[in-house]
Design a protein with these regions (language model features):
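C-terminal effector modules of nucleic-acid-centric enzymes and ribosome-associated factors
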Residues: 1, 11, 127-237
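RNA/tRNA-interacting regions in translation and RNA-turnover enzymes
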Residues: 5
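Conserved catalytic-core segments of large NTP-driven translation/proteostasis enzymes
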Residues: 11-160, 197
Length: 237
């Protein structure tokens, strides 16, 4: 039975970047194989871990927001760059509202500051829970742009079974945000599997991004991943 499952997984991953990835058999019921899984993860990541960028502007894509009695608004997320310090004044994008850092927790421990790569919970003042949602970004004032237009370089997966054509409706993912958009092809009539092209994405609501941000796109329906790319110009003129 395990051999059949392994064959099914290999078949599903065929043609993707995980095609030749190692498979580790683990039992969720007994825990058998967990040690092997940990060793394999350590082996795979040993040469992949890079120094996180703590010297650029702080950016925290928000994945959860809630209120706590006696504290107020709490946000959580993974800091993707820079450093956030208690008492900092930052801005919530695309809301546009400035807020102050009241307290910081990293893995349940109170900290005076947090660094890129850390999973954090931050207590904010001057902003309400209803003003924030998953996909918002906490960053310094005037450091990001809210936009509904993006010029991007888009790469279609080799394994894609569909072709990207002009004005295709897509799901756009970056950070923790998901927004619907239309793809306007700029340099060709269509982009097929394994091909790249320059595309303008016309968003159905504003997003907050910076030049160089990575993204993933999926077809609107059926919701299949088509590829991804990099933002070349937010808010192009």
């Amino acid at each position: 039975w395990l051999e059949m499952m392994e064959e099914d997984v290999r078949e599903e991953l065929s043609g993707t970047f995980l095609e030749h990835a190692p498979l580790v058999k683990v039992s969720a019921a007994t825990g058998a194989g967990l040690d092997d899984l940990v060793k394999e993860i350590e082996h795979q990541t040993r040469d992949e871990v890079v120094q996180k960028d703590i010297h650029t502007i702080p950016r925290l894509p928000i994945d959860r927001v809630f209120t706590l009695s006696g504290f107020g608004t709490i946000i959580t997320g993974t800091l993707v760059s820079g450093t956030i310090t208690k008492e900092d004044t930052l801005q919530m994008y695309p809301v546009g509202k400035e807020c102050k850092i009241r307290s910081i927790q990293v893995h349940g421990e109170d900290k005076k500051e947090c660094y890129a790569g850390q999973r954090v919970a931050i207590n904010l003042s001057n902003v309400k829970k209803k003003e924030i949602k998953r996909g918002c970004v906490l960053a310094p004032p005037n450091s990001m742009k809210n936009t509904d237009l993006l010029d991007v370089k888009l790469n279609v997966l080799d394994s894609s079974v569909r072709i990207l054509t002009n004005h295709t409706r897509l799901h756009f993912f970056t950070g923790t945000s998901e927004v619907l958009c239309r793809a306007v092809l700029l340099d060709k009539e269509e982009i097929g599997p394994g091909e790249s092209g320059y595309v303008q994405l016309r968003m159905e609501e504003e997003v907050a991004v910076r030049r160089g941000d990575k993204f993933v796109v999926r077809f609107y329906s059926p919701m299949e991943t088509i590829g991804g790319g990099v933002v070349l110009e937010p808010n192009p003129k």
